[in-house]
Every structure is written in C-alpha cells, then in structure tokens.
Amino acid sequence: MSDSNKKTCNDAKQPILVLDLVRLVLERLSFVDFHRARCVSSVWYSASKSCIGGTNPTAPWIILFPNEHVKTNNDSCKSIDPRDHSSYTIRDLGFDMVRSRCLASSGSWFLMLDHKTDFHLLNLFTRERIPLPSLESIDGLQMKFVRTGDCGFEMSMYYKAHGLISYGKNSDLRISDAVLWVDEKNGDYFVVWFHHSTFAYHKKGGDNNSWKVFQPSKHQGCINMVFKEGKLYVLNPARNISVFDFSGGHSPVEYATPPSPNDDYYVRNLAVTLSGEVLIISSNPKKCFVKLYKIDPKSSEWRLIKSIGDEALILDLGITVAAKDGVMRNCIYFSHHELLRYKGVSLCNDDKYGICIYHIKTKKKVQEFEHLTTSSPILFKDARWFFPTFGGN
C-alpha cells in the first residue's frame, strides 16, 4: 500500500464500521439466533444494544423450569416457540433455577424466589439480575420475618383482634400470588406479592429499600391478581374484586366492583382486556370446563360470555392481547394450573388442560404440548406463557 493510500485510511472509523456490519447481521436474525449471536464477543454484544429490535416474537412463548428430581444444569431452563415447536435451552444463568420458584413475569423479566427466600428480578436472555429487598425489610407492623438460618425464618403477624401471633420457624414461604411489571425502555419496575392476608409491594426509585405493606379494607385475602396501567386488580376468596390505583405514586387508592358469581366455586382467575374490561375465569384442572364472565354495562351484573372476539387470553399474565401475527383468536393460553403450582406439584397428566391453547367457543384444545408431561420422570416443575422482549420493543 502506498503512503497516500495509508493516509486516506482512518483507523478511528474502523470500530464504527465493524459495529455497523455486526448490527446489519443481528437485525436479520431470529429472536433465538439474535440472543445467541450477541454472546459471541463484546463487539457483538455492544452492537446488539443499539439494534431496534425487529426480532422480538409477536406471539407468546413457553418457558419451562427444571424439576429438582431430574439431572440437569441447575442454572438453565428451556423456552419453546409454539408456532414451529423450536426450543432453546437458556444456559449459564448464574441462578439456581431448580431450587427457585417463578412467581410472575413481564416481558423477558421473571420474579424469582430462591431457596434462601430472597426475591430477584431475572432477565433470562440478558442474564441481568436485580436483587429486591429482603423479607426482613418490610415497612409496617402487620408482618415480620426474622432469619433463623441460611434458608429458614420465623414469621409473625399482627392482627387487630388478636394482637401479635408468631407462626414459628419455617423454611418454605408459599407466596400464593404475585405480579410484576417492568418498563424495559427505562428500567422501571413494580412488584406486588401476597402472603397470609397481607400485600407487600416495591418499586424502583421508592423512598427506601424495603417492602411497603397494605391491606384491603375488608381483609378478604387473595386468590389471583393482575396489574395493568397502574392498577392492581385483586380477586379474593369471596369472589369479589378490589381495585387499587397506584398511579398517584403514594399509598394505593382502593375501589370495588360488583360481587362476582358466588355460585361458581371454580372461579380462580381474573384478567383485564385490551379495552380495560375485567373478566373472571372459572376452570377446574380435574375437569374439562371453562367459563368466562364479564360485567354487563346495563345491569352492572356479571354475565356468562362465550367469546372474547379478536383477542386471546394469556392466563399467566392476566391480560388479553390482539389476535394477530400468530396469536390465536378467541383462545385461552393455559400452562400450569395455579392450584397445582402453589402446592408445588410438577407438570403432570392429571391436569386436564396442562400446557395448551383452548378455543373458547368450540371448547376444544387447538394446540397441545403433551410431550412435556408424558416423560418419566417429569422433566419440568412449572411452565408459563410469556412474551420475549429485548430493548423495550
């Protein structure tokens, strides 16, 4: 190369050109290949951060959590794209997935409770982990936890009628329900969990690094809850729904809705539609039936419905989404029944729904995943539907 040619070559621009080329390659990859490729080197990882994110799947995926009785890498799990049945083993998470429980999800973020009873937010694709306040850090007198060892704790509850009651040592905190919301564009998050008549919540940028406690006015407990657009919807054992508005930034404001059908014992879930309507869902894992109710705007009473139109219900997320780009119309996406999940029962054949897509009008399964529960021993303890996302898209 001549001296003149050497002078026209600007070495300072070479890293930029490399990033541009890598970015062009990344933007043409599928979601799975995209996340594999971004781990090739620091250059590829840097380029992936500036990708617009056209690789995000438009239909929900299934995430599978490994069973402790199966020989596997403790820090891995498996995801499945149901449209083509392609699977992806997510390895080297740096987190003990076997001895941890997933409580909720938002995009690619998962609320995890580990074997030491510590809460974490875990992004399965970026491997990013955010530790949440410990159980001891609870702002309020209603609930108190004291560590008694590496995994154990002692819990005390304060009741107005009975005063302080201690429940002794425990090593297994059974969170009956939880919700998670994450804004992947700016990193904001909001977490709520319920245990023993008390709700605890925490959000990024709060006043302190602790869980704030609140209780519904009627202390009726919780069997399911959903968080959407700043509001927490709580279904209690009496089949009534309370709504807590967190948009004010301070203590939540409570609202009430008409009582749900109290003649239906199997009401276990609620959901919020795209238009903001509240649905309640009745189902039984031992029997093949599903009922959906919503409030009649004229009578303000709950009525049975047989269609949700051009939407699909993702039961794990408690929301409906538009039925397009691979999402099946007028269907419910089932995974692992919450009663079995709460009791720690692994995926099994006794669940008549199991992991499936169920058509509301025909009352038939339009897609099943029996191979995930027919192996012996069962390979997975839990499954959830989720929407993989990266970069806030």
Swiss-Prot record:
The keyword Cytoplasm applies. InterPro entries: F-box_BR-signaling, F-box_dom, KIB1-4_b-propeller. Keywords: Brassinosteroid signaling pathway, Cytoplasm, Nucleus, Ubl conjugation pathway. It is found in: Cytoplasm; Nucleus, Nucleolus. One of its GO terms (biological process) is positive regulation of brassinosteroid mediated signaling pathway. One of its GO terms (cellular component) is cytoplasm. Component of SCF(ASK-cullin-F-box) E3 ubiquitin ligase complexes, which may mediate the ubiquitination and subsequent proteasomal degradation of target proteins. Required for brassinosteroid (BR) signal transduction. Mediates ASK7/BIN2/SK21 inactivation both by competing with substrate binding (e.g. BZR1) and by promoting its ubiquitination and subsequent proteasomal degradation. This is F-box protein KIB4. It comes from Arabidopsis thaliana.
